[in-house]
């Protein structure tokens, strides 16, 4: 079973990074800020705004930077994903 987002929505999986302070202390998950880098796992077909088709600018496999508190977090098949609108994606990491 797959997740197929609708409209201009994108499904991403957050990329966990180990956070270390300048003094070398590794922070536990509870002390970290919410990650903002994610990998795109599914892309909707796009949408129509004011009669004009809005195409999706990201594709599956892209690494993206998203707004800090964007989207809806969901669990599916034991994995955690975030579903958000394309507008909540700030940049593609190349």
Swiss-Prot record:
Gene3D superfamilies: GroES chaperonin. It is found in: Cytoplasm. Keywords: Chaperone, Cytoplasm. GO terms for molecular function: ATP binding; metal ion binding; protein folding chaperone; protein-folding chaperone binding; unfolded protein binding. Heptamer of 7 subunits arranged in a ring. Interacts with the chaperonin GroEL. Belongs to the GroES chaperonin family. This is Co-chaperonin GroES. The gene is groES.
